[in-house]
Amino acid sequence: GDDVKSACCDTCLCTKSNPPICRCVDIRET
């Protein structure tokens, strides 16, 4: 679970919430 969160926040925008919420965008569409 945490590993997925880390990977998500590593490439996506992460909100400064507690717990942090990852807002992933389709970077492949850029």
Curated annotation (Swiss-Prot):
The keyword Disulfide bond applies. GO terms for molecular function: serine-type endopeptidase inhibitor activity. SUPFAM superfamilies: Bowman-Birk inhibitor, BBI (SSF57247). Disulfide bonds join 9-24, 14-22. GO terms for cellular component: extracellular region. Inhibits trypsin (IC(50)=17.60 nM) and, to a lesser extent, alpha-chymotrypsin (IC(50)=2.38 uM). This is Bowman-Birk type proteinase inhibitor 4. It comes from Lathyrus sativus (White vetchling).
